[in-house]
Design a protein with these regions (language model features):
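Short acidic (Asp/Glu) and glycine-rich catalytic loops that position anionic groups and cofactors
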Residues: 1, 38-44, 148-154
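Short, small-residue-biased leader/transition segments that mark boundaries at the very start
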Residues: 3-5
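Hydrophobic alpha-helical scaffolding
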Residues: 8-13, 46-54, 63, 159, ...
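Short, mixed-charge, low-aromatic patches
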Residues: 13-22, 126-133
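Phosphate/diphosphate-binding glycine-rich loops and adjacent basic-rich segments that engage nucleotide
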Residues: 16, 21-34
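Predominant activation on well-ordered alpha-helical scaffold segments within soluble catalytic domains
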Residues: 17-20, 58-65, 121-123, 163-179
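Glycine-rich anion/phosphate-binding loop at the beta-strand->alpha-helix junction
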Residues: 29-145
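Internal helix-turn-beta structural module
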Residues: 131-197
Length: 197
């Protein structure tokens, strides 16, 4: 319902109403819909990730792509960057209270495979639920063409259910990289054990 969509997944009353109406149309048509989940990570320390083999963006994308219904991942401006130019896509740096800061965040908080201290922005494209009540073409085990109709109750969209899955995969990946980063430097290991007293 519209209230469930608004309260749990979509803070905008206007878009929650539009989403509820759209999903009702899909249900009446015995069809389904995909969608996009946006995940933001605030407070990430600078320098998490590696410049080549354990790039933060590659690790996050790999983790999120391993979720069954995910068909695409973008970081920052993602595919919009392909139509941009360097002068517009680069994130200008400046000093704020004695620390580096960025005017924009087209990179989505990751530069050169490592976190840059700004908000990490990730989007996951979720495919439409394949189990729909419309008749669909298929083939048998023997290769004969046929049709199939799936009966039962099916969700018109799984995007809301996948939000917590995306959050969990991102959190596990971030934790793994934080532990890896901590143990990669001898000073960090020494400080960790000395601070336990």
């Amino acid at each position: 319902s519209e209230m469930c969509i608004r309260d749990r997944y979509m803070p905008s009353n206007i878009y929650a109403a539009k989403a509820a109406s759209y999903l009702e149309q899909r249900m009446k048509a015995c069809d389904s819909s995909g969608g996009i989940i946006e995940c933001r990570i605030d407070g990430m320390p600078v320098g998490i990730g590696e410049p080549v083999f354990h790039k933060l963006d590659a690790m996050l994308a790999g983790a999120v792509m391993s979720i069954g219904a995910v068909k695409g991942v973008e970081i920052g401006d993602g595919f919009l960057a392909a139509g941009s130019c360097g002068s517009k896509n680069n994130d200008p740096f400046y000093m704020k209270d004695g620390k580096p800061a960025k005017e924009t965040n087209h990179s989505g908080g990751i530069l050169g495979g490592m976190s840059d201290g700004s908000t990490i922005l990730l989007r996951a494209a979720i495919k439409p639920t394949p189990s729909i009540a419309q008749e669909q073409k298929t083939i048998t085990r023997d290769g004969d063409e046929t049709t199939i109709t799936i009966h039962g109750r099916h969700d018109p969209v799984i995007v809301p259910r996948a939000v917590v899955v995306v959050e969990s995969m991102v959190a596990i990946t971030i934790l793994d990289l934080l532990i890896h980063n901590m143990s990669a430097k001898l000073d960090n290991i020494r400080d960790f054990y000395l601070s336990r007293d």
